[in-house]
Amino acid sequence: MIKKILTTCFGLVFGFCVFGVGLVAIAILVTYPKLPSLDSLQHYQPKMPLTIYSADGEVIGMYGEQRREFTKIGDFPEVLRNAVIAAEDKRFYRHWGVDVWGVARAAVGNVVSGSVQSGASTITQQVAKNFYLSSEKTFTRKFNEVLLAYKIEQSLSKDKILELYFNQIYLGQRAYGFASAAQIYFNKNVRDLTLAEAAMLAGLPKAPSAYNPIVNPERAKLRQKYILNNMLEEKMITVQQRDQALNEELHYERFVRKIDQSALYVAEMVRQELYEKYGEDAYTQGFKVYTTVRADHQKVATEALRKALRNFDRGSSYRGAENYIDLSKSEDVEETVSQYLSGLYTVDKMVPAVVLDVTKKKNVVIQLPGGRRVTLDRRALGFAARAVNNEKMGEDRIRRGAVIRVKNNGGRWAVVQEPLLQGALVSLDAKTGAVRALVGGYDFHSKTFNRAVQAMRQPGSTFKPFVYSAALSKGMTASTVVNDAPISLPGKGPNGSVWTPKNSDGRYSGYITLRQALTASKNMVSIRILMSIGVGYAQQYIRRFGFRSSELPASLSMALGTGETTPLKVAEAYSVFANGGYRVSSHVIDKIYDRDGRLRAQMQPLVAGQNAPQAIDPRNAYIMYKIMQDVVRVGTARGAAALGRTDIAGKTGTTNDNKDAWFVGFNPDVVTAVYIGFDKPKSMGRVGYGGTIAVPVWVDYMRFALKGKQGKGMKMPEGVVSSNGEYYMKERMVTDPGLTLDNSGIAPQPSRRAKEDDGGAAEGGRQAADDEVRQDMQETPVLPSNTGSKQQQLDSLF
């Protein structure tokens, strides 16, 4: 009877086993063909960030969620490979993808618990899961994982599997792969890890947060000890090595990639261009983009602009806290503030801080990045003292939770604020259009709006040279005499009213030459010139410089620069004067490399004198250059003469009520445009002239940019002649008699006080010297041939 029962039981068990094996076999036969292809493993391309460099190799931008450096398995030190194997898969080199003994142990534990509580995933299984499967704990997912692991083992070598694991695994702190983790946790190359450091990192794959040595040092230490004991058990290390590693004091030094903060506007321009071409792949394919800007030029340009904006803001009242965080519900105020401050940047030595308390004496206790606390007394508060708990300032008052800026002045902290005034600087290679420096504002972090390329502003008198160039092309000369006298134009004002434009300084010089008029920036002369050549002709001609029709008003006000354009476009247009009349295109990208170091794209720029289209007659460009040299020598931009160079030319610009101030200066090699103004246009007051606020920025930058470069000046082209100190096109030494100039009107005589006063010239500079007025020679001119620009042929960047 017992024998019969045993036989029956054995038969049932055997039957169930056969049935189970059959089911498993069927499941394998059904599932295995449906497993995903291993192409992503065999041709592994990890997500790598977009990195942007200056021309001299400085990192100026990095974009992408995953910070990763792909490393060959042979470049990982043996001590790290052993530590990971000891921690995750001691039988890695001895199994076929699944550790059967480990599975058995885990199965027993899961049966006892009644659910999937633990596994025995090998490194190969983890690779399968990380690349193809979810993290859910189900028997179906585990079954697929086992089959995938087997398939991987049949297709890839053990070292290749290990290489995939070492590069793909997430290890906390935004570190993907052990090479990245070595930098982030210890700030060192993975090849330089000690045994103790390797064992610590090897503990992270199991639970990156739980075993993070920075956040949970005690748990991480226990995990490290476990791994070292495993290594000893596997005869990977000796007892002495284990003990030394356990006693080694580890120093955690988070790696912070230094990104040049002065070129963030340039980096953002590149990011946008790459995103337009590649979409989200731009952030994962490991592109390395080299730009045309130099890091040292960027630093000088940024400081030059910031200096002017700071100086303008000096003496302004305190505008209030820049932000506010609610600390009333925080259980750990110090940690809350630290987390908040970690997302802010120190800009121009202005350090972000959060107010923790305001004392009865109205002293302010602040917390700085790093946790340091500082008490600011009334002296340290300075101009911000009135804002302390001032209910009249509403949300902008200084109170608990207020975010403010402070600066360390010789060991004493004081409240400061970022200036409200903004600006931009653009510097181009005149012959190629390559951007050498570009600053889009005071601080990219607070306002990413790039004023160099996005701010549409009136260029004011910096636009006049284009009108004068059109006049030379139409039949005038640099010595054409025009009456600088008031003029009234019926029907040209708002709603058909009378337009009575004025010179900005209220002074009129009577009959003066074009050279004198541009040097002193005379509005009346510019208007009379445009009346003579015609608005339509001027629009058509000025488009040769790269301006769009929408930027050129179809009215006489165009002569005063009332159209709107960007600083970059103005700099690009001035390059036509600088390079002898050729149209070049601005660009910031020079080369693009892929993750493997292969050159993917290289800019082939239009070059003046080679493949760039001729925009204007080179003689026209030369004569304009010589006229604008006088603007620097004796005119509204005399501040630029501080460089002591004879090859500089340029033009200032100031719009109505001093809302926008400009200076564009150049020599035959470099064009630099500076714009200053508020984001919400308003008057800058008495100092808001191009000659007083924009020129100093230009000088500070160009002093560096032109250092060591000889000032040769522009070479006079063929067909230009000089007579009585003036320059003419050979065939045109007189004004075209077919042109009609309205020289009516009488210039009012200045008062005796005005005669004695040197100041108050156009745009706030000193009055330009009154050269002797030259009368035109009465000869019949020969008009030049058509010099309209060709269609640009800029090679595709991608």
From Swiss-Prot:
GO terms for biological process: cell wall organization; peptidoglycan biosynthetic process; proteolysis; regulation of cell shape; response to antibiotic. The keyword Cell membrane applies. Residues 783-798 have a biased composition (Polar residues). It is a single-pass type II membrane protein. It catalyses: [GlcNAc-(1->4)-Mur2Ac(oyl-L-Ala-gamma-D-Glu-L-Lys-D-Ala-D-Ala)](n)-di-trans,octa-cis-undecaprenyl diphosphate + beta-D-GlcNAc-(1->4)-Mur2Ac(oyl-L-Ala-gamma-D-Glu-L-Lys-D-Ala-D-Ala)-di-trans,octa-cis-undecaprenyl diphosphate = [GlcNAc-(1->4)-Mur2Ac(oyl-L-Ala-gamma-D-Glu-L-Lys-D-Ala-D-Ala)](n+1)-di-trans,octa-cis-undecaprenyl diphosphate + di-trans,octa-cis-undecaprenyl diphosphate + H(+); Preferential cleavage: (Ac)2-L-Lys-D-Ala-|-D-Ala. Also transpeptidation of peptidyl-alanyl moieties that are N-acyl substituents of D-alanine. Its main location: membrane. GO terms for cellular component: outer membrane-bounded periplasmic space; plasma membrane. Cell wall formation. Synthesis of cross-linked peptidoglycan from the lipid intermediates. The enzyme has a penicillin-insensitive transglycosylase N-terminal domain (formation of linear glycan strands) and a penicillin-sensitive transpeptidase C-terminal domain (cross-linking of the peptide subunits). This is Penicillin-binding protein 1A. It comes from Neisseria meningitidis serogroup B (strain ATCC BAA-335 / MC58).
